[in-house]
Amino acid sequence: MPVHLPAHSRRRFLAHLAGGVVAIHGAAQLSAAEAEGEKWVLFSDTHVAADRMKEARGVNMAANLERAVKAALAKGQGVKGVFVNGDCAFNTGEAEDYATFTGLIDPLRQSGLPVHLTLGNHDHRENIRKGLKEAGDKKTVVTDKQVSIVEGKAANWFLLDTLELVNKTPGLLGEAQLAWLQKELDARTDKPAIVMMHHNPDVKEKPTGLKDTAKLWEVLAPRKQVKALFYGHSHTWTVEQHESGIHQINLPAVAYVFNQAMTNGWVEVSLAAKQMTLRLHAFRVDFADNGKDKVLTWRS
């Protein structure tokens, strides 16, 4: 049951295809030059509560999401869509949390931007449907998991579901989802693949991130079309590279930080044929990476 919130306007809409695939309308008609400037907005860990005045760790989560939405809208017409990478809700994923979340992101949809969601450990599969009311096809291609593919011109985005137990820290993909991912990657070798999931890779004996990280890399590493892996969960901004050459990007939280040396904020992504450019929009304006471009070249 992929969770996609279509744009309200007719400027851009989504074509829902079989098997959890979503195509951005008009992407196939983009010229190579237009594809070079394909931009996306990435949010993670918004942790919105039903009460817009709710605070955690000294932060009003609703106000932070509102701030991120306004900044993203200021980017103009070049943005193709928005991804929210899990932990959309505050704690246990109540339906009322998602109702508030929907209201906060509605200006994006009003402006013509579709919004694509993944689930984190503070989300709830049933309640997200109740709270969002309109979130795409309810059919599942992997039992009890939300998976989907967003097909852009410059890259395909593979959205995974790492939610194992609500309000329990670690995450899990599971064998069925890994098999789905392998199959869908093998069917799409014509353009770069970007994988997105909520939980961070974690190979510790007692992981707090993704429990089946090693199995995920067995799928991703040998498939050369896979160029980048985005995740959140740790409320940390880092850009690293796996030994396979796949770029690993830990998205900052829109909500709050666990470490005061870190920043919250959001990330702007610009795709090209052989590279991706990241720009961090930090809420801490004095943060070292704020506003700076990081150019990541695709592995060959």
Role assignments for model-derived ranges:
Residues E34, V267-S300:
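A short C-terminal boundary segment appended to hydrolase-like catalytic domains
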Residues V48-K54, V166-N167, V257-N259, A288-D289:
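Short, solvent-exposed loop/turn elements at domain surfaces
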Residues M196-N200, K227-W237:
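Histidine-centered catalytic micro-motifs
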Residues P2-H25:
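N-terminal secretory signal peptides and thylakoid transit peptides that target proteins
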Residues E94-K183, A187-R188, P192, D212-Q225, ...:
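Extended active-site neighborhood of metal-dependent phosphoesterases/phosphodiesterases
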